[in-house]
């Protein structure tokens, strides 16, 4: 499709393709502006898990992600785009000491979306009870890769 917009149908097809290819069990998404797509993906059999972007949802996984990075427990295969986004990311702390990731300036063209997606994935991983899954998780043997 050409033009200035990416088709929702194309995005949905790519999500479903990647979910099948990588055996995605759950898909975390920011519910803001995604209700229709989430419903359609649910109808296609993908388990959609709302994951808000505020400090309440992002605090624990952000702190764990930072710890895992510092302890060299995360591998991203040298992905230059994720590395660039990590350099753009800033931690914002609220009055309660809870943190989330943001850009230095909300109008900045420097992106952090990949970092936020990584933190959301780690947040879902934190919620996922391995013992409830009949299959052994690959993460138990090789660790988490983003």
Each model region followed by its residue ranges:
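Nucleic-acid-processing active sites and adjacent nucleic-acid-binding tracks
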Residues: 1-26
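Helical mechanochemical/support elements of P-loop NTPase systems and associated helical scaffolds
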Residues: 7, 11, 33, 57-61
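Short glycine-rich phosphate-binding loop at a beta-alpha junction
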Residues: 21-33, 38
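Acidic, low-complexity intrinsically disordered tails
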Residues: 131-146
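Metal-dependent DNA phosphodiester-chemistry modules and their immediately adjacent helices/loops
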Residues: 16, 40-133
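Compositionally biased, intrinsically disordered low-complexity regions
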Residues: 4-5, 30, 99, 145
